[in-house]
């Protein structure tokens, strides 16, 4: 997402505030200020000259980079109501999660969520289930353990699937053919392919009724809620939101597999020792994953 206009003032102010804060933190460390050691390393490298280092390149990746660099972007800006949010856990700020929950509660027909690292909070689980009971269709897309660069996180996140999907068996949801909750896991390959061609999906965006969207760095996991400073933009524009929704359906879901209640039981009862170890160990570390 590319933005311009008054919202940039908030983004720049946030960057400058963060930069000033971390400079202050570094300077407060005295001899443990990492800048001292970076400068010493640079000075040593300057004296010894450039060090020849061997490296391996992947020509396929190089070609992709060249193609992207040569691609001309035809940017068509659209006016949109827009607001920029930042979460700073050290101040117990939860603005982005509030924006997600409020947008889900306000949705009338459809909620589409793509999120790289998904370990749901209780508030999120209950809000999604309440939306389904109002005949809203909710589709959540996240990584599978096979595609996640942090597979343990996906394994822990799977523990929440059953609690979410079971709402589909409630009479209020079953009476709404177009409603209910779906969970999809990114496979990194198209539905008609056998070979994985893509790695971790790193997207973090959501679309509500193809009218309001959230795009940013916020993951639905404990780390984003409790540790990391995250940012996101919330905007209202039907054309732009519809473009995101089309990308979600036509591209992202085509690289993914829908999870069933039977799958969730298999996840819980897995006899794979390595899988179970990762799960139990991950649960111990869930608050910082």
Task: Give residue spans per PLM region.
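Charged, low-complexity intrinsically disordered terminal segments
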Residues: 1-289
């Amino acid at each position: 997402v590319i933005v311009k206009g008054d919202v940039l003032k908030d983004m720049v102010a946030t960057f400058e505030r963060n930069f000033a804060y971390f400079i202050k933190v570094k300077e407060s460390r005295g001899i443990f200020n990492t800048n001292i050691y970076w400068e010493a390393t640079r000075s040593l490298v300057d004296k010894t000259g450039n060090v020849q280092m061997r490296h391996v390149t992947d020509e396929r990746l190089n070609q992709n980079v060249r193609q992207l660099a040569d691609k001309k972007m035809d940017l068509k800006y659209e006016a949109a109501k827009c607001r920029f949010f930042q979460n700073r856990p050290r101040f117990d700020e939860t603005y982005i999660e509030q924006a997600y929950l409020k947008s889900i509660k306000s949705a009338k027909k459809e909620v589409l969520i793509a999120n790289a690292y998904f370990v749901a909070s209780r508030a999120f689980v209950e809000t999604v289930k309440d939306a389904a009971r109002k005949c809203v269709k909710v589709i959540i897309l996240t990584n599978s353990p096979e595609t996640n660069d942090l597979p343990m996180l996906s394994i822990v996140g799977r523990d929440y699937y059953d609690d979410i999907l079971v709402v589909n068996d409630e009479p209020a949801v079953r009476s709404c053919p177009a409603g209910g909750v779906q969970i999809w896991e990114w496979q990194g390959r198209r539905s008609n392919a056998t070979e994985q061609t893509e790695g971790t999906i790193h997207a973090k965006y959501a679309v509500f009724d193809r009218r309001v969207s959230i795009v940013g760095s916020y993951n639905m996991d404990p780390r984003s809620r409790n540790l990391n400073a995250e940012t996101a933009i919330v905007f209202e524009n039907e054309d732009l939101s519809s473009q995101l929704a089309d990308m979600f359906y036509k591209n992202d879901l085509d690289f993914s597999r829908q999870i069933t209640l039977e799958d969730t039981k298999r996840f819980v009862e897995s006899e794979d020792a390595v899988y179970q170890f990762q799960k139990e160990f991950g649960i111990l570390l869930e608050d910082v994953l």
